[in-house]
Amino acid sequence: VYISQSAKIAEHVSFGYNVVVEENVTIDRNVTIGHNVVIRKDTHIGEGSVIADNTVLGKTPFKASTSATTDDKLLPPLNIGKHVTIGANCVIYRGVQIDDYVFIGDLASVREDVQIGERTIVGRGVSIENKTKVGRYVKIETEAYITAISTIEDYCFIAPEVTFTNDNYLGRTEERKIHFRGPILRKGARIGANATILPGIEIGEDALIAAGSVVTKDVPPRKVFAGVPAREFRDVPTEQLLENQSYYVGE
């Protein structure tokens, strides 16, 4: 284990083998760190959190010469709240805010300028790109792709292998750079497995997108859309509305 002299480690913190803790890292009490974890400078890990093997925390992004959404700027430190669990082989970048009781599965990647609200679940192999906001009590399931500049409000559900997109120009023309915008999911929206959401689309509160759909236009609240391209199918059943769920705690 390597621990910088400027790091601040509270009581009852356990480390696996080959851990690296860089300058000015702060680790609160009762944190568990697995084997081969790298904690980059200035990172904060809140009380009772668990970091599994081979994970990198606080990574500074590299900018490709042709990247259109990665900024050259000084990012704030990675801040991990209390009782957060981060699985094995994850990469969490600098400039991320993870609130209390978040669960992040193995092999997930969370880019810079991302906020994740309390008690949200980020599944195995999920990618969350930069400049994205994820609310509270959200579930993002295995291998979903959340593109840059997206918004996911509280209580949303995103099934496995859903794809968000943000570039209608598919990498061509300079004009595209002023139009980058990911989807917006309003509170309680649900997206079925393997659905694709095109750039800038807004999915209304409590709306439902059926599995395999391609969403090319905004979806009103409390409506079910299905198909390629997705079209209105029916109203969301009353018993499925967020307000009627036992786990819903309101604002």
Protein language model regions, located:
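Structural signal for interior beta-strand "rungs" in well-ordered beta-sheet cores
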Residues: 1-64, 68-226, 231-232
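A glycine/serine/threonine-rich, flexible loop-to-helix segment
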Residues: 222, 236-250
